[in-house]
Amino acid sequence: MVMNMNHLHIFVKVGEKLNITEAAKELFISQPAVSKAIKNLESSLQLKLLIRDKHHGLMLTDIGKEILLLARQMKGIESKIYQVANRENKLLNGKVKIGSFPAVSTNIMPQAIAAFRSNYPLIRIELIEGTSDQIKGWVEDRTVDIGIAASPFEPFENQLLCNDYMVAVIPPQRDELKLEKHVDLETYQDDLIFCKGGHEIAMSNAFSQYNIELKENLTVQNAETLINMVKNNLGIGIISNFTLSSVPHQLIKKDIFPRVTRDIGVIAHSFEEITPAAHEFVKVLKAVVI
């Protein structure tokens, strides 16, 4: 059984896009060439990797999903081999795929990418944004080389970037809160607006520790929406200080009780196994944050 690496690369793209046309466009080859490569790969493996469903279109078979995960690992190893060779020849190139949540993309990434490009102009960077849970999933299935996510980091290896904590933002109409040193979450539990962003476990643990009932009266997907909700006096916003710093606003910020903290860090299956390019990006990232 001889496997063509080019066919494997094409399969990875098709497996990610689940669309022959889109895969062909991104690979800059014809649709028939893509279809032929998939057919040849299936023939060499004697497996059916993809099926076409009447309602859902192109889908991976169960074994196709397993092969896709292994194929991504093989691509990573191939890239690492070239990068190790290039590093030895004083010429680091390739591509780094990074999973990041929006606040990191706003607060940290511009400076980190600028610093990285000044040292490694031949390395391409692909930034994929999502929630912390999505990023952990992308690291797990090797869609990205590294991810930047909020704690807890298990089961991945992690390198700490910074500490973070939850704060409250209060509506301008709530005069009784302006003089408060902090917002007591138990007292105002019916007024809280939450923003999804990787702090859910930390919040849940704090509420459990202090025997406070966690009432998710209103939960939004992003910081901008939370700010607008608070502006319109719909409640008290609970958001991470790091995320809040990435959004312009004129609301009053208050500490909360009980105090809720979390960490933000870089995660990977193994930092020893990531490519030289990804390893260098982690070093630059940590230098920028410090």
Curated annotation (Swiss-Prot):
Keywords: DNA-binding, Transcription, Transcription regulation. GO terms for biological process: positive regulation of gene expression. Gene3D superfamilies: 3.40.190.290, Winged helix-like DNA-binding domain superfamily/Winged helix DNA-binding domain. One of its GO terms (molecular function) is sequence-specific DNA binding. Residues 1-61 form the HTH lysR-type domain. Coiled coil: none annotated. It comes from the Bacteria. InterPro entries: LysR_subst-bd, Tscrpt_reg_HTH_LysR, WH-like_DNA-bd_sf, WH_DNA-bd_sf. Residues 20-39 bind DNA. The keyword Transcription applies. Belongs to the LysR transcriptional regulatory family. PANTHER family: TRANSCRIPTIONAL ACTIVATOR PROTEIN LYSR. This is Uncharacterized HTH-type transcriptional regulator YoaU. It comes from Bacillus subtilis (strain 168). The lineage of its organism: Bacteria, Bacillati, Bacillota, Bacilli, Bacillales. The gene is yoaU.
